[in-house]
Regions:
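Fe(II)/2-oxoglutarate oxygenase catalytic core
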Residues: 2-255, 259-291
Length: 291
């Protein structure tokens, strides 16, 4: 634990992640108050804030301190807004959606390790998830430290993948769940894009392995060979010592760095229990191929 100006930062994991306390992020923050939060974000990659009851306006205001927000595409129930709904509740009735409804099947892709918006030409900086309604058990969010994953790669493998380009698409991750799950409109909105296999932090220079479920193949490689490399990298990254799991309670807010971590949801009983999480996504400023 250490005091950083107006906030206290307590590590959650030896490698990454920290709880930030001593500040109310539901109110407007001055640059002096936000500065230590941004510095902690660059250092720890995942920040947890407890007991921060958010409404939509407050979440937008806090999120915009990190940068401009992405607009949600047509594949999400909150299309056209600045939010992504991660919920089993019908947006009109507030009641649980049947498990065989396409809206619930679509969300199963969140069980795969991924980085939000890696399927966009300019991938996102970070995501902010607020817990509005939590199930009594399950529904955790897990994170992988991809800085540690990169550092653990053999130098020869680092050298091999450094010049490579992967192709990412939302279609690739959704096809892992069920082919035909995306509408033609959603596919047209988000054609495949090219990403490097790493992302660098411009503040501290830390490099992170950049893969995930949206990555489909390696540009210029035979399909099977590229898929095998991506699988090998994912297996090397998914180590218990690189993993942080968070059990949500209402009022929690987590900010995570999409340049430096992968994340995934864990199972909960969506028939018995209600869950409503609301995400904002802060856009990046540079295509990874320009690194």
């Amino acid at each position: 634990m250490r005091n950083t100006g107006p906030i206290t930062v307590t590590k959650l994991h030896p490698l990454f992640g920290a709880e930030v306390s001593g500040i109310d992020i539901t109110r407007p923050l001055s640059p002096r108050e936000f500065g230590p939060i941004r510095a902690a974000f660059e250092e720890y990659s995942v920040l947890l804030f407890r007991d921060q009851p958010m409404d939509d306006d407050k979440q937008i205001a806090f999120s915009e301190l990190f940068g401009p927000l992405e607009t949600t595409g047509s594949a999400n129930p909150a299309a056209g807004t600045k939010f992504q709904r991660q919920s089993n509740l019908d947006i009109m009735t507030g009641e649980p959606i049947p498990p065989d409804d396409m809206r619930m099947i679509y969300q199963k892709a969140n069980y795969f390790w991924h980085s939000d918006s890696s399927f966009k030409r300019v991938p996102s900086l970070c995501s902010i998830l607020t817990a509005r309604v939590c199930p009594p058990e399950g529904g955790n969010t897990e994170f992988l430290c991809m800085r540690a994953a990169w550092d653990a790669l053999p130098p020869a493998l680092q050298a091999t993948i450094q010049p490579l380009i992967a192709e990412h698409a939302l279609l690739y991750s959704r096809n892992r769940v069920q082919k035909g799950i995306l509408s033609a409109k959603a596919i047209a909105e988000l054609p495949p894009v090219k990403q490097r296999l790493y992302r660098d932090n411009p503040i501290n220079g830390r490099r992170a392995l950049y893969i995930g479920a949206h990555a489909g193949h390696i540009v210029g490689w035979p399909k099977a060979t590229g898929e095998a490399l991506l699988y090998e990298l994912s297996q090397r990254a998914d180590q218990p010592e690189f993993r942080l799991s968070h059990a949500w309670r209402e009022g929690d807010v987590i900010v995570w760095d999409n340049r430096a971590v992968l994340h995934r949801a864990t199972y909960y009983d969506a028939v018995k229990h209600k869950r409503f999480m609301q995400r904002t996504t802060i856009g990046g400023n540079l295509p990874t191929v320009a690194q």
